[in-house]
Amino acid sequence: MKYRDLRDFLSLLEQRGELKRISQPIDPYLEMTEIADRTLRAGGPALLFENPKGYSMPVLCNLFGTAKRVAMGMGQEDVSALRDVGKLLAFLKEPDPPKGFRDLFDKLPKFKQVLNMPTKRLNSAPCQEQVWQGEDVDLSRIPVMHCWPEDAAPLVSWGLTITRGPHKERQNLGIYRQQVLGKNKLIMRWLSHRGGALDYQEWCEAHPGERFPVAVALGADPATILAAVTPVPDTLSEYAFAGLLRGHKTEVVKCLSNDLEVPASAEIVLEGYIEQGDMAPEGPYGDHTGYYNEIDNFPVFTVTHITQRQDAIYHSTYTGRPPDEPAVMGVALNEVFVPILQKQFPEIVDFYLPPEGCSYRLAVVTIKKQYAGHAKRVMMGVWSFLRQFMYTKFVIVCDDDINARDWNDVIWAITTRMDPSRDTVLIENTPIDYLDFASPVSGLGSKMGLDATNKWPAETPREWGRPIKMDEDVRARIDALWDELAIFSDKDAKR
């Protein structure tokens, strides 16, 4: 699936019945959240609010409200194809040298994809068709959603934040929520381990007292947005990976006020800086956990320029108790994670982040167990291999006869294959999401691993149970006889 920008992607969605235009006046204050939430929970389309109350700019919501649309945004026709995206990332993360001519020929498609990686720099771009600067900068022109009744202020939710550290050639792209503080000020809520925060910290150390340049793109194309939330190798830029997903190079343009490069087709771009030491209390906000989070201090982003396309569209979302868009994206990106993990741990059969676990707080892993203690090694690997799992609080490891995506199977394994004392791993004083109010200290808490695998002789002195299973010949005979028995009125009833 090929598209060039967000508008092109919306046209594709509309052709497939995946976009609903809403002409009625809808208020960005709470009403859009309620409509988007009901639509997402019903598996409905992306929503384009054409007449937000009090604004002339349309609002796009629920863009990634189904796993199918996430896959479409990554250039694939269905979610299962995202495994191929994961295989490509695994290859780029740790490329294997060709073993011979035939192997080289087999790898040529991957090398061809890499050709789409470099960005294409433009001298002028659609995102700079209209420009406001200085006193003309006014964020109140943008219909920023106020999502929940007790939220502190309107919140920019899909801000693709572009930064560059003082010692880095490539830029970092990250999605960080931003509280509207005034007509030209936002609060940049980035956690200390995230790329933007690390760039800022390095800048402060290298350039004490100097302003840190920042740009925020709103309404970038889906490939660029999704690249920013995908486990891209540290040596690969998100723009480059977006080019791979899209099938052609990412087009960028230099900001008007600094040297950062932004997506050329973005609907809106905010340019500005962070003054060192300029902090403000952020929150509370309803977040993806289903609760309002605590108030904490974060840097203030001062906007000096707003550039945008003609007839710009504001891309927004809400976060709340799962399912929400982050949870749906987690389900889709789950398929990307599996090949990356399997590259490092070939014994992994499946890996699942249940959306009801707030996208990343609980993981279920199934493995081909090969030795005593194997499950514990896998737990440690999950927590340490990808930074995306740094905040995963619970890891459940099961054998490959268990379906990681079926709670009936997983709960059966936990309750029949675990001894709570022997098979529970507790690790204290580990990094935890700052939004996790259950941890005893903000940003620091514990992790739990559950070994729900069959135990080997070295792990237990007792005879281990054998699962009950019907004789296959008997099953075949009853299969042939089943319809004739007519036990259920519906012949297609589950057996």
From Swiss-Prot:
Keywords: Cell membrane, Decarboxylase, Flavoprotein, FMN, Lyase, Manganese, Membrane, Metal-binding, Ubiquinone biosynthesis. Homohexamer. It comes from Yersinia pseudotuberculosis serotype O:1b (strain IP 31758). Its cofactor is prenylated FMN; Mn(2+). Mn(2+) binds at residues 172, 238. Prenylated FMN binds at residues 175-177, 189-191, 194-195. Its main location: membrane. Binds 1 prenylated FMN per subunit. One of its GO terms (biological process) is ubiquinone biosynthetic process. InterPro entries: UbiD, UbiD-like_C, UbiD-like_N, UbiD_bacteria, UbiD_Rift_dom. One of its GO terms (cellular component) is plasma membrane. Catalyzes the decarboxylation of 3-octaprenyl-4-hydroxy benzoate to 2-octaprenylphenol, an intermediate step in ubiquinone biosynthesis. Pfam families: UbiD (PF01977), UbiD_C (PF20696), UbiD_N (PF20695). The gene is ubiD. Its EC number is 4.1.1.98. This is 3-octaprenyl-4-hydroxybenzoate carboxy-lyase. It is found in: Cell membrane. It catalyses: a 4-hydroxy-3-(all-trans-polyprenyl)benzoate + H(+) = a 2-(all-trans-polyprenyl)phenol + CO2. Belongs to the UbiD family. The active site is at residue 287. It is a peripheral membrane protein.
